[in-house]
Amino acid sequence: MVKMIVGLGNPGSKYDNTKHNIGFMAIDTIVKNLDINFTEEKNFKALVGSTFINQEKIYFVKPVTFMNNSGIAVKALLTYYNISIQDLIVIYDDLDMEVGKIRFRQKGSAGGHNGIKSIISHIGTQEFDRIKIGIGRPKQGMTVINHVLGKFDQDDDITIKNTLNKVDNAVNYYLQMKNFEKTMQKYNG
């Protein structure tokens, strides 16, 4: 069995630690604790790291296509490594959830998220597992684009660190249990 866990974000240091890059931040937290290094897979437009957990190959992916084209990298890697859509998890930001909240979902629409729209368009289904991380709504007078491409407020630093650790724990629980539904029950909150 092979699994692929994808964190969404935008490439380049200009986007480091922005709200829209919380998926990249989550992947970075997970792989750091597993001592995995990324290599750039130019053919797939992604940074990819891998390891074995319980005799399963696990790929950790950060597409470098920019958010709105994430589906290009996801589809290419699923096809190349012959990974089932049932073995895909995507981690990304959600405007409609308060900062630091986590929600696990087994399927659903893109909900206005362009990275998820791209993935759905390229793989041809909404039926894949996801972990949404709340980044909150823009403050009065701020545009959505400035909000998602902005950094978290200093007041949110501890919340975000705790959230990333919770996502790390949840992903590791999932990889041990091999059951997304049980992970949802334990970590949705």
From Swiss-Prot:
Alphabetic keyword roster: Cytoplasm, Hydrolase, RNA-binding, tRNA-binding
Record bears the keyword tRNA-binding: yes
UniProt enzyme class: hydrolase
Residues that bind tRNA: 15, 66, 68, 114
Feature type site, description Discriminates between blocked and unblocked aminoacyl-tRNA: 10
Pfam families: Pept_tRNA_hydro
An annotated GO BP: protein quality control for misfolded or incompletely synthesized proteins
Keyword Cell membrane: no
Catalytic reactions of this protein: an N-acyl-L-alpha-aminoacyl-tRNA + H2O = an N-acyl-L-amino acid + a tRNA + H(+)
Sites marked Stabilizes the basic form of H active site to accept a proton: 93
Gene Ontology molecular functions: peptidyl-tRNA hydrolase activity; tRNA binding
Record: active site: 20
EC number(s) from the headed UniProt entry: 3.1.1.29
Subcellular location: Cytoplasm
This protein's name: Peptidyl-tRNA hydrolase
Organism: Streptococcus uberis (strain ATCC BAA-854 / 0140J)
Gene: pth
